């Protein structure tokens, strides 16, 4: 460990003090309640003032919660009395307040824990003189980078970053970043009490507790999980910097607009040194391998590693990840779950697209004096296709069609007004058209839009107790067609502004937009 003082210094520099007393301030829970209500925007990327406190009943509910927290004696554990040490009550009569307790406190904790990291981020941008608007990068910006950089790669590896089995692993990662001791003690205490409450109330097994926690406390879980992912990538960059004689050519950080901790990180390395972390935590021999060209792209929990090197190099790179997770983060991960494939014969699924490398061969006749000969030129093209099977599976789970892709009605929407039903289906179609506008072939997307269009017609016919044919004959088929082909003009990588393809269009050009700030919901569930 003496050989790597830079790592310890980096960890100390990342430590941030926290204001533990803020947990007992009323406005923190009001702010958390506002975020729970689904207000758009970010706490640190929008206006500094907090707007939207227009629901007096909701504020009264938050006020009642704060009063109960202040008055309740069993909020903190009582020494030598485990029966009274209850964070939330799990009696049936207090179920609403119990759930409300855990949601508000976890949201309030997540808001407080984000503040030092956001201040550090803002200071970084001010030091680099980078305007905020330049950092609002689109998810689609990854694909032009992959089209230019992955065309010369030979192998690609899909990496699904694993979730730690126990929440304590995520808590331990924060210990090198937090100086406030009460915060360090409060988080494990809250997680332990939350786990016991769920286990006693719903008979949830310990293996499923992290899943339940991630579903009900999304903001806090995202922060903890992204801290863990950031630690993985920080170690990767740290090991790279130890080899100073090889230069890191490009390193970019992209932050998502809505939540700064839901980040997209792009790491492009040229002449990278791969270092295998030994079992005795850096005290053993470090052996390295020179890679002439390596690309690493990650979004949320999935990463893609592409290389121009050999299969042996990719295999060593795979074990580098496995050893990092097993011996540094202390949880088991099987190496066979990371697949290494030859890019020319493989299509990988990433960010809602099926991407592959297509080889185009062209014959050129050259004439030199009296001799003529043919030259075969092979060029690589990065192909992006709409994953029709995955999207149909997502539509089937959402009850828009059958497993085979036959449209069905949406019964739970049948009670809504006709305009609301058409608006919901139309919004889904527009979002899919917008998100998958970079596809090389649009036939699959036309099929998805047809399923949604006919599902909308079946839902309206079900509501009016009629058949689809009679309903469309009475209102006219042009009603749905005109609505579903209506598109908004948005800024794209092809200037000037262009309008996406229509329902019956035959456009083949790929359009990457600059306003895609999150993954489409259907893509996330596929």
UniProtKB/Swiss-Prot annotation:
Instruction: Name any Gene Ontology BP term.
Output: mRNA processing
The molecular function terms of the Gene Ontology recorded here are: RNA binding
The entry's keywords: Chloroplast, mRNA processing, Plastid, RNA-binding, tRNA processing
State the source organism's domain of life: Eukaryota
Q: Specify the signal sequence span.
A: none
Question: An example Gene Ontology cellular component term from the record?
Answer: chloroplast
Cellular location(s): Plastid, Chloroplast
Give TM segment ranges: none
Family the UniProt entry places it in: Belongs to the intron maturase 2 family. MatK subfamily.
Q: What does this protein do?
A: Usually encoded in the trnK tRNA gene intron. Probably assists in splicing its own and other chloroplast group II introns.
Listed name of the protein: Maturase K
């Amino acid at each position: 460990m003496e050989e790597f003082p830079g790592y310890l210094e980096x960890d100390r520099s990342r430590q941030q003090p926290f204001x533990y007393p803020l947990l007992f301030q009323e406005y923190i829970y009001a702010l958390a309640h506002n975020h729970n209500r689904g207000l758009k925007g970010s706490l640190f990327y929008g206006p500094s003032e907090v707007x939207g406190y227009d629901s007096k009943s909701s504020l009264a509910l938050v006020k009642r919660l704060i009063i109960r927290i202040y008055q309740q004696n069993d909020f903190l554990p009582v020494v030598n009395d485990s029966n009274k040490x209850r964070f939330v009550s799990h009696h049936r009569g207090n179920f609403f307040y119990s759930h409300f307790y855990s949601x508000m406190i976890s949201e309030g904790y997540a808001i407080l824990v984000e503040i030092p990291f956001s201040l550090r981020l803002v200071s970084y941008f001010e030091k680099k003189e980078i305007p905020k608007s330049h950092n609002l990068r689109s998810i689609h910006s990854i694909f032009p980078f992959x089209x230019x950089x992955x065309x010369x790669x030979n192998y690609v590896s899909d990496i699904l970053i694993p979730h730690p089995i126990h929440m304590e692993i995520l808590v331990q990662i924060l210990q090198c970043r937090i100086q406030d001791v009460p915060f360090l003690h409060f988080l494990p205490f809250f997680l332990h009490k939350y786990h016991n409450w769920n286990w006693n109330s719903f008979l949830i097994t310990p293996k499923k507790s992290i899943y339940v926690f991630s579903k009900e406390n999304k903001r806090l879980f995202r922060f903890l999980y992204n801290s863990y992912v950031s630690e993985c990538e920080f170690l990767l960059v740290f090991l790279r910097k130890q080899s100073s004689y090889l230069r890191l050519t490009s390193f970019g950080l992209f932050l998502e607009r809505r939540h700064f901790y839901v980040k997209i990180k792009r790491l492009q390395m040229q002449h990278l040194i791969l270092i295998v972390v030994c079992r005795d935590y850096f005290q053993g021999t470090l052996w390295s391998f020179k890679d002439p060209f390596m690309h690493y792209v990650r979004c949320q929990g999935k990463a893609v590693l592409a290389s121009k090197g050999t299969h042996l190099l990719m295999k060593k790179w795979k074990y580098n990840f496995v050893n990092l997770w097993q011996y540094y983060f202390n949880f088991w991960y099987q190496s066979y779950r990371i697949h290494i494939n030859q890019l020319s014969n493989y299509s990988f699924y990433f960010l809602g697209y099926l991407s592959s490398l297509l080889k185009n061969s062209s014959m050129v006749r050259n004439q030199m004096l009296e001799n003529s000969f043919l030259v075969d030129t092979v060029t690589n093209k990065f192909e992006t296709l709409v994953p029709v099977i995955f999207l149909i599976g997502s539509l089937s789970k959402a009850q828009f069609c059958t497993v085979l892709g036959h449209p069905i009605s949406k019964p739970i929407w049948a009670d809504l007004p006709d305009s609301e039903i058409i608006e919901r289906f139309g919004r889904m179609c527009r979002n899919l058209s917008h998100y998958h506008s970079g596809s090389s072939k649009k036939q699959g997307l036309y099929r998805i839009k047809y399923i949604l269009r006919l599902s909308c017609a079946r839902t309206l016919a079900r509501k009016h107790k009629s058949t689809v044919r009679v309903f469309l004959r009475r209102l006219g088929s042009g009603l749905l067609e005109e609505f579903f082909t209506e598109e908004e003009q948005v800024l794209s990588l092809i200037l000037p502004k262009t309008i996406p393809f229509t329902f019956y269009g035959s456009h083949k050009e790929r359009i990457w937009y600059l306003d895609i700030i999150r993954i489409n919901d259907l893509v996330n569930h596929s």
